[in-house]
Amino acid sequence: MLFRSLVLPALVAVTTSDADFLVMVKPQFEVGREKLGAGGVVRDPALRLAAIEEVARSAWEMGLGVEGVTASPLPGPSGNVEYFLWLRRASAQLSRERAEIAISQGPR
C-alpha cells in the first residue's frame, strides 16, 4: 500500500514523460497484514494476483500502462514471491491473463 500511495506518485512526478519504470511488487506489503501467512509470507496465488493488479491499477490511474510483467526468479528471504512490472506511458493496461501467466510461471 505504501508503494501505491507514496512511492509511485513521487516517481511519476519527478520523471519525464518518456521514462520507463521497473518496479518490484512485493505482495507482502500490498495485501495487508491480516492476509499474511506464517512468517509474513503471501502463499495464496489469488492474493499475489490482487497485489499485482492493484499496483497496475494505481499506475494506470497515474497514466502508466504495463509493458511487461514477470515473477522474480528468486523468492524473498522468507519465501515471498515478488514480481516485476515494467511501466511506461502509452502502454496498455494490464490484463488479468498476463498477470496470471506471471504468477503461474514464477516460483511456488
Whereabouts are the PLM-identified features?
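A short glycine-rich, Lys/Arg-flanked "PGG" loop and its adjoining helix->strand segment in the class I
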Residues: 8-22
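Flexible, glycine-/basic-rich loop-and-beta segments that form/coincide
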Residues: 81, 85-108
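Residue-level signal for inorganic ion chemistry
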Residues: 26, 79
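Short, glycine-/aromatic-enriched active-site segment of Class I SAM-dependent methyltransferases
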Residues: 27-44
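Short, small-residue-biased leader/transition segments that mark boundaries at the very start
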Residues: 1-2
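Conserved S-adenosyl-L-methionine
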Residues: 64-75
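Short alpha-helix
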Residues: 48-62
